[in-house]
Regions:
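Active-site neighborhoods and metal-handling regions in enzymes and metal-associated proteins
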Residues: 1-391
Length: 391
């Protein structure tokens, strides 16, 4: 019996997805859907391709679904093709010198000379122009939003994978708490997270960290690029950590205080984050709307603070709708989007990042949740608290 190298969804799960995509094609009058993925956001810009194929790739990849042919993925880099064949649940081919030309020729070869083509993702302008110039019979329609709505409701298999990603994330955060100490560099904190994640079998997705003195002047939100700053006693460290099970990540945020309890300002920031978090979690259930979430977030401004990062976002795999801030932060984050209604088996991250107006101080608290029939289940096991280490 051969060893299983990578996690795989069942054939039934992939067939369910392909059926849903083909129904989208019927509804929108499409002859084919071309799904684009890149290595952005630590490969989570491959989320749509992963949904079709189970391949978590790098570089530019295109998955093609038609009505009558089995789905196929075109992998841009020739040396990535063997690995794609080890993990993909669909046919894999090389994308050739130009994936745009290869995809176009494939569609012609299967009889779609004058095709209405739905594309998904941030397709490069070079690809789009190549389709226009070299395949003038194609009519192209952006169906990204419609396609991603298919991914909002998680299947039982997806929920199982997300639970595993959340457990990996908890493990990595616990390693950070155990290993963090004054004298380390910020980037060395990232090493603690990655080592724990990889040694447990998880894939590091992201670890955003920021450190600074409680007296102010540090970053109010976790940094996407870890600095060389030396950790000192009295610091606060804000965290955003995601570790995945073959792309399906958890996501959690907790502040860590080095050697000292939070001062009065940071205690008020924490108390506000916790209260807004609990208010939000309380309203989450099928039928709840983005207005309910905005109501929960009003307490942040009432306490004299604002937010930098979003208040709630959809998740799994990668970012999904909705993306919700607070009413009072619309001037800095843009206006609220259209009304969003939550449904059972959606996954969302509740993540209040409560900051001072001058953004010289802030904390972030967050967890990944599964919307259940009667509420919301937290998928993380790390206690709902701030952590003081080295005291």
């Amino acid at each position: 019996m051969s060893e299983v190298l990578y996690p795989n969804f069942s054939p039934q799960e992939l067939a369910r997805r392909h059926k849903a995509i083909r129904q989208l094609m019927v509804d929108d009058g499409l002859d084919a859907v071309v799904v684009y993925g890149s290595s952005g956001v630590n490969r989570h810009d491959q989320a749509d391709v992963h949904y079709v194929s189970n391949f978590l790739g790098n570089r530019n990849n295109y998955a093609v679904v038609t009505h009558h042919e089995p789905p196929v993925i075109f992998v841009q880099s020739f040396n990535h093709v063997p690995n794609a064949r080890e993990s993909s649940g669909i046919r894999v081919e090389w994308g050739g010198i130009s994936s745009a030309a290869t995809v176009g020729k494939y569609l012609l070869d299967v009889g779609l000379k004058n095709a209405k083509l739905g594309y998904v993702g941030d397709v490069p302008v070079q690809t789009y122009l190549a389709w226009q110039l070299d395949f003038p019979g194609f009519q192209m329609v952006d169906v990204t939003r419609t396609f991603r709505r298919l991914r909002l409701i998680k299947s039982a298999e997806e929920i199982d994978w997300i639970r595993k990603g959340a457990a990996f994330t908890d493990h990595a955060f616990n390693a950070l708490v155990e290993g963090a100490r004054p004298g380390l560099r910020e980037y060395e904190l990232g090493m603690l997270i990655e080592t724990a994640a990889l040694s447990a079998g998880g894939l590091p997705h992201l670890h955003y960290l920021s450190s600074g003195p409680q007296s102010g002047g540090g970053a109010c939100v976790p940094r996407q690029n870890l600095s060389s700053r030396l950790i000192e006693s009295g610091d606060v460290i804000n965290t955003e950590i995601s570790v995945s099970h073959w792309g399906y990540s958890g996501q959690m945020h907790r502040p860590i205080f080095m050697g000292q309890q939070p001062n009065d300002l940071y205690r008020r920031l924490w108390d506000t984050a916790l209260e807004s978090y609990e208010r939000c979690v309380k309203v989450l259930r099928p039928g709840a709307t983005s207005e309910d979430v905005l109501d929960a977030g009003d307490i942040i401004a009432e306490r004299g603070f604002t937010i930098n990062d979003g208040f709630l976002h959809g998740f799994g795999i990668g970012l999904l709708p909705p993306s919700i801030g607070t009413r009072q932060s619309a001037d800095r984050r843009g206006p609220a989007g259209p009304l969003f209604t939550f449904k059972e088996n959606m996954c969302v991250v509740v993540q209040p990042n409560v900051v001072t107006d001058d953004e010289r101080a802030g904390v972030q608290l967050g967890n990944l949740f599964l919307i259940t029939a009667d509420g919301a289940e937290c998928l993380h096991g790390v206690p709902l608290q701030y952590f003081v280490v080295g005291a």
